[in-house]
């Protein structure tokens, strides 16, 4: 992940995001707590989860259901 992309991820801290992982799996609509250091700290299903940054290949903001477009 490029330095610019890491900065973009850090800007999403405190919001809900979707993460695409290197193994082909996804973590959808998780709360991004922190993207500093070598791990991404998320809150998913009532649990803290720490994902190695090297495993994250893409990310984007989660869409809010019922939000006005």
PLM-predicted stretches and their roles:
Residues 27-34:
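Short beta-strand-centered aromatic/proline hotspots
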Residues 38-41:
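Short aromatic-glycine-enriched beta-strand elements
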Residues 1-24, 36, 46-69:
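Short glycine-rich, low-complexity segments
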């Amino acid at each position: 992940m490029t330095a610019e992309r890491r900065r973009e991820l850090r800007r999403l801290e405190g919001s809900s995001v979707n993460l695409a992982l290197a193994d082909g799996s996804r973590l959808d609509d998780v709360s991004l707590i922190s993207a500093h250091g070598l791990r991404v700290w998320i809150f998913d299903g009532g649990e803290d989860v720490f994902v190695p940054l090297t495993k994250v290949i893409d990310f984007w903001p989660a869409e809010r259901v019922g939000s006005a477009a």
